[in-house]
C-alpha cells in the first residue's frame, strides 16, 4: 500500500526508505499506536511538520510547536466519548492545540462565548466560567480537534492547503472504525464536510451552524440548524447514557 500511495497518489514525492523516529511526530504514544500510521504516512506527516517548522523561521505560526499535537496528550483515544471539530487555530497567541480552548489568562473568544451561552441555556446548573480553558473536557474524553492544526498570524485559513486535511481526516475515520458509540459534534461547513468519514450506524452525528457570533444568530443563510438552541450537549449525554457510557460533565471547567 505504501508503494502504491507513493507512486499513484503522491507521485513519489516522499521517500519511505528512511525510518521515522515516532518522537518526531509530536503525537502521544497511545495515539501513535491507535492510528497505526504506515511508514509512508509517518514520513508524510513528518514532512508536513518540517514544513511548518521552516515557516516559523519567517512568520508567526499558531499554535507553538510544543502545543501542535496537544490534543493527543490531553485525551487518550480509548477514552473518547465526544469529538468536537473546530476549523483552524485561534490567533493572537490564544491557540493551545485544543479546538475552541484558550489558556486561562486569555480572554474568552467570541465562538467560545457562544458555546458557553448555549450551555447555560440548555444544561441545568451550568455556570459560565471566567476563563476559556477546556482541558477538563479533554480529560473526560472530549476530543477537541481542529480540522487544520496550524495557521499563520493574521491570515485565517492560510494553512488549509498545506496538507492537514488528510491527517485530520485519517484521525476521524480511525475513531469511527475502531471505536463505538461516540458522539461527533460538527459545527459549520468545514466540520460537516467530514460527515462521510463517520459511520452513523455506530456513532451519533450532530450538525449545526458554527458557533461564531454571526452564524449562531442566524446571520448566514444555512441548511443547518442554528447553533443557539441546538441542544447538542444534552443530546450527546442522552446518547452516551443509552449506550451505558459515562456522560460528560460540561460544567466541570477547572483552570
UniProtKB/Swiss-Prot annotation:
InterPro entries: UDG_fam1, Ura-DNA_Glyclase_AS, Uracil-DNA_glycosylase-like, Uracil-DNA_glycosylase-like_sf. The keyword Cell membrane does not apply. It is an enzyme of class 3 (hydrolase). Its main location: host cell. GO terms for cellular component: host cell nucleus. It is found in: Host nucleus. One of its GO terms (molecular function) is uracil DNA N-glycosylase activity. One of its GO terms (biological process) is base-excision repair, AP site formation via deaminated base removal. The active site is at residue 88. It comes from the Viruses. It catalyses: Hydrolyzes single-stranded DNA or mismatched double-stranded DNA and polynucleotides, releasing free uracil. Its EC number is 3.2.2.27. HAMAP family: UDG (MF_00148). Excises uracil residues from the DNA which can arise as a result of misincorporation of dUMP residues by DNA polymerase or deamination of cytosines. Therefore may reduce deleterious uracil incorporation into the viral genome, particularly in terminally differentiated cells which lack DNA repair enzymes. Belongs to the uracil-DNA glycosylase (UDG) superfamily. UNG family. This is Uracil-DNA glycosylase. It comes from Human herpesvirus 8 type P (isolate GK18) (HHV-8). The gene is ORF46.
Amino acid at each position: 500500500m505504501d508503494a502504491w500511495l507513493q507512486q499513484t497518489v503522491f507521485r513519489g514525492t516522499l521517500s519511505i526508505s528512511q525510518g521515522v523516529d515516532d518522537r518526531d511526530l509530536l503525537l502521544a504514544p497511545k495515539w501513535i499506536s491507535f492510528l497505526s500510521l504506515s511508514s509512508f504516512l509517518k514520513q508524510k506527516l513528518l514532512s508536513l511538520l518540517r514544513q511548518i517548522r521552516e515557516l516559523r523561521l519567517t512568520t508567526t505560526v499558531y499554535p507553538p510547536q510544543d502545543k501542535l499535537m496537544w490534543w493527543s496528550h490531553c485525551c487518550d483515544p480509548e477514552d473518547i466519548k465526544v469529538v468536537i471539530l473546530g476549523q483552524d487555530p485561534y490567533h493572537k497567541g490564544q491557540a493551545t492545540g485544543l479546538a475552541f480552548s484558550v489558556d486561562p489568562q486569555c480572554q474568552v473568544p467570541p465562538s467560545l462565548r457562544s458555546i458557553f451561552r448555549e450551555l447555560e441555556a440548555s444544561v441545568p446548573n451550568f455556570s459560565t466560567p471566567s476563563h476559556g480553558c477546556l482541558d477538563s473536557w479533554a480529560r473526560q474524553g472530549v476530543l477537541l480537534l481542529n480540522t487544520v492544526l496550524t495557521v499563520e498570524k493574521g491570515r485565517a485559513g492560510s494553512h488549509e492547503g498545506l496538507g492537514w486535511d488528510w491527517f485530520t481526516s485519517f484521525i476521524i475515520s480511525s475513531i469511527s472504525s475502531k471505536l463505538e458509540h461516540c458522539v461527533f459534534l460538527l459545527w459549520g461547513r468545514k466540520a460537516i464536510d467530514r460527515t462521510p468519514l463517520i459511520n452513523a450506524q455506530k456513532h451519533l452525528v450532530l450538525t449545526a451552524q458554527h458557533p461564531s457570533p454571526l452564524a449562531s444568530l442566524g446571520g448566514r443563510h444555512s441548511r443547518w440548524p442554528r447553533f443557539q438552541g441546538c441542544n447538542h450537549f444534552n443530546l450527546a449525554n442522552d446518547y452516551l447514557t443509552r449506550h451505558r457510557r459515562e456522560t460528560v460533565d460540561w460544567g466541570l471547567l477547572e483552570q
